[in-house]
């Protein structure tokens, strides 16, 4: 039994080493890092006033939005969340290319259309797409394998590259 266990362990180790070597030699797996920009979580809430009070008790401060329009953005250090009442059904992870955590425009960044192009090449399926013939603000949506929505939402002019 011990010999069988050792043989199986050696076989799996060989498979893992061969798989790793093969994967490293495939150019499509060598991925350029993406500059996704500022990250926040957009929460679909039922009662924006109750949600705002809850997050303020956690130390978050309102930094943007309009409560009367049922959306606000709260921040605590580098953590940023958006509260949205009646605007979408599920929570969304949001990336803002070109923005710092305090909504300052970066001098150089990957435009949302460049990110979209790279993700298409990697086989990512899109829920909505940015118009690649335009410049400036644009957005697209994708979903991860579990159905979580990711929004890539550029609010600033395209960088001059």
Residue ranges and their predicted role:
Residues 1-9:
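Bacterial N-terminal signal peptides that target proteins for export
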Residues 71, 80, 92, 139-141:
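Short hydrophobic/aromatic beta-strand element in the GNAT-like acyltransferase core
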Residues 65, 84-87, 132-134, 152-159:
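Short beta->alpha transition motifs characteristic of CBS
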Residues 40, 92-94:
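Structural preference for beta-strand elements that scaffold enzyme active sites
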Residues 46-49, 87-88, 95-149:
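Vicinal oxygen chelate
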Residues 35, 42-87:
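Core segments of cupin and vicinal oxygen chelate
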Residues 12, 17-49, 155-161:
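N-terminal beta-strand motif that seeds the catalytic metal site of vicinal oxygen chelate
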């Amino acid at each position: 039994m011990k010999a069988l266990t050792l043989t199986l362990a050696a076989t799996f180790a060989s498979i893992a080493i061969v798989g790793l070597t093969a994967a490293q030699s495939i150019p499509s797996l060598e991925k350029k890092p993406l500059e996704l920009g500022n990250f926040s979580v957009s929460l679909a809430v039922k009662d924006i006033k109750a949600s705002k009070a809850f997050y303020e008790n956690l130390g978050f401060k309102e930094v943007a939005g309009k409560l009367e329009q049922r959306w606000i953005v709260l921040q605590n250090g580098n953590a940023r969340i958006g509260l949205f009442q009646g605007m979408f059904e599920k929570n969304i992870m949001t990336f803002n290319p070109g923005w710092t955590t305090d909504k300052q425009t970066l001098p150089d960044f990957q435009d949302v259309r460049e990110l979209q192009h790279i993700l298409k090449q990697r086989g990512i399926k899109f829920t909505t797409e940015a118009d690649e013939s335009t410049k400036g603000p644009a957005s697209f949506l994708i979903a991860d394998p579990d159905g979580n929505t990711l929004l890539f939402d550029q609010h600033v002019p395209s960088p001059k590259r």
